[in-house]
Amino acid sequence: MRFIHTADIHLGATPESKMDWAVHRGDEMWGTFERLIKKVKEDEIELLIIAGDLFHRQPLLRELKEVDYLFSTIPDTKVVLCAGNHDAIKKGSFYRNFEWNKNVYFLDSKTVDCVPIDDLGVDVYGLSYYKNEITEPLYDDIQIKNPYRINILVAHGGDDKHIPINKRKI
């Protein structure tokens, strides 16, 4: 299986916003994401994992539609993503009711959930942030459903304020 794992893309960010080139830098981030999708298509990647913070803040509806359109250009690739601490699923978030393309699996649970991707023989585990800081070690008690499949954890965080990870318990 060929897959790409990425995180912290931060679409919508304007780094160093007081600089003259800040708007262009934000556009470059979108361009980089578009090149990633093109690379997925060219290399016939079977699974694309985005482990949080696709956006730097709550995504606008038009931004979700644009991302979903890009995902629609790679219909043979399964896409699994979750919300991170920057784009956490808060009240009023467009993430809550967004209908993704059929090749996209959005891990929208507050607790670890499993997405089985049968045609790849893969189970993908993960959760989404619903607030910017989570101090509970939510990944510690994962129960693998089928040890004979490929099991992948999509985890965002790892420090004391962002779902601490104890490697011995995973």
Each model region followed by its residue ranges:
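N-terminal active-site segment of His-dependent metallophosphoesterases
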Residues: M1-E66
